[in-house]
C-alpha cells in the first residue's frame, strides 16, 4: 500500500485508466466478433478505425493493430472470392 500522497494519486489514476483501457479493448473484440459473424466492408471499417484509435492512444501496440487489420482484410478478400466463385 502506498504511503506517499503522490503514490496514492498515481494508484488511483492507474486503476481508472486500467478500467477505461479494458473497456476499449472489449469494444474492439466485440467489433471483431461482429465482423466475423457478418463479413462486410462496413464492419471491417469499424474494426480498422477502432484498432487505429487504440494503437494511437497506446492501448494496444501498433504492430498488433496492423496484424489485426491484415488478418481481417484477408478474411474479407477470401469471402469475396468464394462468393464470386459460387456465382459462376
Swiss-Prot record:
Region Disordered, annotated ranges: 1-25
Compositionally biased residues, Basic and acidic residues: 1-17
The keyword rRNA-binding is annotated on this UniProt entry: yes
GO MF annotations, alphabetized: rRNA binding; structural constituent of ribosome
Pfam families the record matches: Ribosomal_S20p (PF01649)
Entry keywords, A to Z: Ribonucleoprotein, Ribosomal protein, RNA-binding, rRNA-binding
GO terms classed as biological process: translation
Physiological role: Binds directly to 16S ribosomal RNA.
Family designation: Belongs to the bacterial ribosomal protein bS20 family.
Protein's recorded name: Small ribosomal subunit protein bS20
Lineage, top ranks: Bacteria, Bacillati, Mycoplasmatota, Mycoplasmoidales, Mycoplasmoidaceae
Gene name in the database record: rpsT
Amino acid at each position: 500500500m502506498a504511503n506517499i500522497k503522490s503514490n496514492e494519486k498515481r494508484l488511483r489514476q492507474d486503476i481508472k485508466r486500467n478500467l477505461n483501457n479494458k473497456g476499449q479493448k472489449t469494444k474492439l473484440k466485440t467489433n471483431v466478433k461482429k465482423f466475423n459473424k457478418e463479413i462486410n466492408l462496413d464492419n471491417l471499417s469499424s474494426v480498422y478505425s477502432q484498432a487505429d484509435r487504440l494503437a494511437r492512444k497506446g492501448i494496444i501496440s501498433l504492430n498488433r493493430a496492423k496484424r489485426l487489420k491484415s488478418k481481417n482484410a484477408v478474411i474479407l478478400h477470401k469471402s469475396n472470392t468464394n462468393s464470386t466463385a459460387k456465382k459462376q
